[in-house]
Amino acid sequence: MQFGAVTDIGMHRKINEDNYYVNESDTFPYAVVADGMGGHQAGEVASMMVVDIIENHLEKNLDTELDYVEAGEVIRQAFISANSIIYNYAKNHYKVMGMGTTATLAMIYQNKIITAHVGDSRAYMIGDEIKQITKDHSYVQELVSRGEISPEMAKNHPKKNYITRAMGAEDTVKVDISIKPYNGETLVLCSDGLTNFVEDDEIRTYIKNKSNLQKSAEEL
């Protein structure tokens, strides 16, 4: 299995608040991305914490005797644990009070794609077409779901970056879990630092036209 990963501060921020982890094991291959928020490096702290906590939780609790539904529940509990730890850390450290982060994970296990997410960092599945697996927890996505605006209007909405769910924002969190068949597609996980500037079809083109996923990630 081939992996590629990169994080870049870009031209619009002074601090890179994104973090990621890739687990390249044959048994439980997965990747997680996080996009922090909170200012004064608090977002960077939150995204780093969520990635580390999820990694540690999964390392301790994933087992090959689990079926894919049970593995999904282990992932959910990893997110819930991370949320609680980040929330309490922020509450007790005034310099990072109010910090939070998105978190999106995708794992391939037993020929299934298991995804978990909170916030608006996305997971895509790329085969002949590109398909967004996750559904943004954002203000504009709620407007789209209610039919009040179109997906095209959402791209330029003044509140397009307002998220409605974040890790560490409250003492509890609802984690969306999805399980889909895996048929050899390429999975892409990314923060809005990519999707705010690159169209879905462009992402697909970069991925499909490159044999090396690391080069694809770096060019995107």
Label each residue range with its predicted role:
Residues 1-220:
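PP2C/PPM-type serine/threonine phosphatase catalytic domain
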